[in-house]
Each structure stands twice: as C-alpha cells, then as structure tokens.
Amino acid sequence: MLVVQMPFSFPMAHFILFVFTVSTIFHVQQRLAKIQAMWELPVQIPVLASTSKALGPSQLRGMWTINAIGRLGNQMGEYATLYALAKMNGRPAFIPAQMHSTLAPIFRITLPVLHSATASRIPWQNYHLNDWMEEEYRHIPGEYVRFTGYPCSWTFYHHLRQEILQEFTLHDHVREEAQKFLRGLQVNGSRPGTFVGVHVRRGDYVHVMPKVWKGVVADRRYLQQALDWFRARYSSLIFVVTSNGMAWCRENIDTSHGDVVFAGDGIEGSPAKDFALLTQCNHTIMTIGTFGIWAAYLTGGDTIYLANYTLPDSPFLKIFKPEAAFLPEWTGIAADLSPLLKH
C-alpha cells in the first residue's frame, strides 16, 4: 500500500527545536556547575587506613620521608634508612627533591620524589632517629612521618643488603669511567691483580674532631699499618688513594713500594668520581666518616677502619655507636690518642 507522507509541520519543527535547545543549555549548565564545584574544593590528604601492613605494595597508605642533610655519605644513610623503615612498617617512602639531586646522578635509585610544593602542604609528624636501630622503630605510628637526624648504620638495613646494593648501583657511565682509570694502572710494569681503595677523610674533621669531639683523624702511622696489613695478605696489589686532603696524603703515605696511586680529585661538591673509584676496587681502607663507610659497604671484600678514635668521655659516643657503624667482619686498627692527652 502506498503511504503518502505529509510534509513536516513548520510549527511542530520549531517546537521540537526549542525543546532540544533548552535541554542542551540546561545540561551544559549542570555539567559546568559540577566542574566548578570540583575546582573550588580544597585539596585534601585522603583519610588512610591504619592497617596498611596487611595491604599489598600497590595499596600502601600514607607517606613517609626523611630530611636531606649532609653530603653524599649522610644522604645515602638517610635514603637507606628510609627505605628500610618504610618497608618494615608497611608505608610508602618518598625522598625530598634535594636528596634526589644528590643521589640520582650517581646511582640507580628507585624511590619516588616528593617535591617541596607538595611536602609543604602535608601535616608531617617529625620523628627523630638515633644513629642505630631501635626496637621501637619496627612499630612507628603515623601515616605522614618525616624522619630527622643523621642515621647511617647497617643495623637499619643490613637485612635488605641486596636491595640496598641494587639501589646504590652506579650508572653505567659513572662505573665505566672508574673502571677505565683502574684498567690503566700498573705496578712495576704489570697490571695489578688486587685493587685496594683508600679513603682519607680530612677537611673540617681535622679541627672538629679534637676541638669538639675529643677525637683524632687518621695519622701517618695508621695508614702505614693499614697498607702493610694488605701487603702481608695479597700480592700484585695497588692502593688507589682518594681524599679531601690529597696534599697531606702525598706527604704522609709511603710510596716507596711503587704500589700507591693518588687517584681522586677530592672535590667534595662533586664526589661521584672518588666514590666510584673506591667501589670498583676489591677491598677498602677507610679512616672516619660516612663516605668511607658506604664505600666499604658497597665494595665488599676486606675492610680496615680507624677504631677507638675518641677518648672514652667523648660526647661523640652519645650519638655514635662504633658497633652499629662498622660491620663485625671489618678489621679495626686503634687510633693513636696521645695527641689528645698532651693537652
């Protein structure tokens, strides 16, 4: 059957168009009102569950961070401590931008960065840490915790040693530069079979240790004993010396065996070269300070360190426990405290 379609009514078309237009305008206004309301809402920190230890890694609640103070060795200690304590307590860890700027050019660190603009809006609970692990640190309350202090002790993170070593893996170009230098070294015309990194901390410690902490820095006698310790145990070796007092080292380290090279540049503001050289060696001689401690920790092998370098009544021993700083398998050589006793 043929159906004849009537032409669309002109008034009806206008009516439908009017309804469509009004409906569209109303819908758009409602959407804009919702968007504006979202913009006007204050940024809030979400209310988080206190049972985060039972959650998976992707569900960790809260935010923990740590102060970024001191130079390279200090900030490595702060990073590793934050890494370990956050994992122990089931909280996500974030590092300050300043710490990232110090560590990221050298190491393949993985913790996310907390920028200062964000950090300033968080109601932090400051939590001071001693320089050694305490039982109470296994159960730290609070979702937004900022650690303070200078923690640098294997007692915090040694149970995660492989993970810490992974975090402090050198970038390829940093490692290769150090290895290229070491490959070019010779002892009496032949390539050495054993490399011993030597770090001599001087700088401000030369004055701070005796005047503030009733202590000493490494002297000529200690370094001679440390070098001889390795010479008695290894053949075909070379000592790779780095220091922030290289002129003193050149005058006080015996080079008559032909097995000592003064390699580091001693520039504290850019320590990557010296640190990389030390960690690419097989063994370590350190004096005092976190730079040497971390070099020895990452290197492995045998480590000789300066022991008993303060008087028994030193205030330094209230904030520093030698047994928490030096691994049990490391070998200490006692410092000569006689210069302190003369005053």
Swiss-Prot record:
Pathway(s) this gene product operates in, as recorded in its UniProt entry: Protein modification; protein glycosylation
Superkingdom of the organism of origin: Eukaryota
Coiled coil location: none
Localization per Swiss-Prot or TrEMBL: Golgi apparatus, Golgi stack membrane
Any one Gene Ontology BP term: regulation of endothelial cell proliferation
UniProt cross-references to Pfam families, sorted A to Z: Glyco_transf_11 (PF01531)
Keywords: Blood group antigen, Glycoprotein, Glycosyltransferase, Golgi apparatus, Lipid metabolism, Membrane, Signal-anchor, Transferase, Transmembrane, Transmembrane helix
UniProt main location, coarse: Golgi
Lumenal side: 29-343
CDD domains: Fut1_Fut2_like
InterPro entries: Glyco_trans_11
A GO CC term assigned to this protein in UniProt: Golgi membrane
Signal peptide start and end residues: none
Gene Ontology MF annotations: alpha-(1,2)-fucosyltransferase activity; fucosyltransferase activity; galactoside 2-alpha-L-fucosyltransferase activity
List of glycosylated residues: N188, N282, N308
Tissue expr: Small intestine, colon and lung.
Bilayer topology annotation: Single-pass type II membrane protein
Entry's EC annotation: 2.4.1.69, 2.4.1.344
Catalytic activity reported: a beta-D-galactosyl-(1->3)-N-acetyl-beta-D-glucosaminyl derivative + GDP-beta-L-fucose = an alpha-L-Fuc-(1->2)-beta-D-Gal-(1->3)-beta-D-GlcNAc derivative + GDP + H(+); a beta-D-galactosyl-(1->4)-N-acetyl-beta-D-glucosaminyl derivative + GDP-beta-L-fucose = an alpha-L-Fuc-(1->2)-beta-D-Gal-(1->4)-beta-D-GlcNAc derivative + GDP + H(+); a neolactoside nLc4Cer + GDP-beta-L-fucose = a neolactoside IV(2)-alpha-Fuc-nLc4Cer + GDP + H(+); a neolactoside nLc4Cer(d18:1(4E)) + GDP-beta-L-fucose = a neolactoside IV(2)-alpha-Fuc-nLc4Cer(d18:1(4E)) + GDP + H(+)
Miscellaneous note of the record: There are two genes (FUT1 and FUT2) which encode galactoside 2-L-fucosyltransferase. They are expressed in a tissue-specific manner with expression restricted to cells of mesodermal or endodermal origin respectively.
Protein family: Belongs to the glycosyltransferase 11 family.
Function (record text): Catalyzes the transfer of L-fucose, from a guanosine diphosphate-beta-L-fucose, to the terminal galactose on both O- and N-linked glycans chains of cell surface glycoproteins and glycolipids and the resulting epitope regulates several processes such as cell-cell interaction including host-microbe interaction, cell surface expression and cell proliferation. Preferentially fucosylates gangliosides GA1 and GM1 in the antrum, cecum and colon and in the female reproductive organs.
Protein name per the record: Galactoside alpha-(1,2)-fucosyltransferase 2
Species this chain originates from: Homo sapiens
Gene of this entry: FUT2
